Structures are given as C-alpha cells and as structure tokens.
Amino acid sequence: MLVKTHITKIGVTLFAVALFYGFIYMLSNSLFATRPATAVAVGADGKALLPSVDEAAMPAKAPAAAAPAAETAEAAAPAEPAAPPPPAYVEVDPATITGDAKAGEEKFNKTCKACHKIDGKNAVGPHLNGVIGRATATVEGFKYSTAMKNHVGNWTPERLDIYLVSPKAEVPGTKMSFVGLPEAADRANVIAYLNTLPR
C-alpha cells in the first residue's frame, strides 16, 4: 500500500510538472512567436537609429462615424487645386557650391556610399547621379516613403544642406536611417562632390 501511494504521488508530481512546462511553452509561444524579429541599427556615434515605418504595411484605419451635416457640406466643397509638381531639374548657380569636392568625395565614400551609388543604379537608397537640382523623390525605379514623396521641391544646395543635418528631423517618416552630418564643412564638401556627378 505504501508503494502504491508513493507511486501515485510521483505520478501526480510528474503530471503537475508536465502541465506547468506545457503552460509555460504555450504562453511563450503566444507571447513571442507572433512578433516579428527586429534588429536595431546603430549609428557611427553608437546611438540607436529609429526604424522607419512602412505606411503601406499599416492596417487601414477604421472609418469614422457619420459626420454632422455641416461638416459634410464643408467636406463636399471643392478643394483648392493641387500645387503643380516641381520641374524635373532646376539650374543651380555654381557660386552657391562652396565646398571642396575632393574632400566631399572622401566623406561620401565613408558615410554615404554604403547606401547610395553613383553609377546610375539604385541600392538601399536612390542613386545620386544628378541629385543637385533634381526634383525630390523622382529617381526611376526607387520606392520612396510617403514622407519623402510629400517632401516636394528640388534638391538645391541649400535644401540638401538642411536635409543632411538630420534627415529624420527634416522629413519625419523617411526611410533614410542616416543620422546626418552635423558639421557644416562636411555638408558643403559632400554637396560640392555631388555637384560633380553627371545627370
């Protein structure tokens, strides 16, 4: 009888342990298996770079409740005509390019070349041939973020200078993960180099 009781206790204990580990296994699968794997990119300064959000992959927003008649009438009013698109290229006064192209090429090779090519082919980022004066988000075959598509205008030296300080601050939602060039001389040199590239 003592042996039978002992065997019963062992069986109950084993069952409880198996149940516990089964519960832990199911819980961990439900908590962790449905989440996508993520990695955190780190910039040259050692700080984490924020990932961009692909707006196309986001779930559609729920439709809003029916609006009152006054708001509906306002919405039905004709919208202002959209601004015309910028020209494909604008001419840039060479006097506005003040940097050293040779130093800019060196800086480009260290900080930009991993994502941007200068052979007319796209990579992680669009190619930069003819970028000076080109309309934003217009490189054929490159899939731009909605934020960059809405950043309408042309890449003048002044506009590139502002953008290169901090791309994510200038165009929130851009896919470009580069933290920026804080030094004005570096930006001027890179812009001078980019101006030497053919269209």
From Swiss-Prot:
**Swiss-Prot/TrEMBL keywords:** Cell membrane, Electron transport, Heme, Iron, Membrane, Metal-binding, Photosynthesis, Transmembrane, Transmembrane helix, Transport
A molecular function GO annotation: metal ion binding
Q: Which GO terms describe its biological process?
A: photosynthesis
Membrane topology field: Single-pass membrane protein
The known PTMs are summarized as: Binds 1 heme c group covalently per subunit.
Listed transmembrane segments: 7-27
* Pfam families per the UniProt record, alphabetical: Cytochrom_C (PF00034)
The protein's name is: Cytochrome c-type cyt cy
Origin organism of this chain? Rhodobacter capsulatus (strain ATCC BAA-309 / NBRC 16581 / SB1003)
- Organismal lineage: Bacteria, Pseudomonadati, Pseudomonadota, Alphaproteobacteria, Rhodobacterales
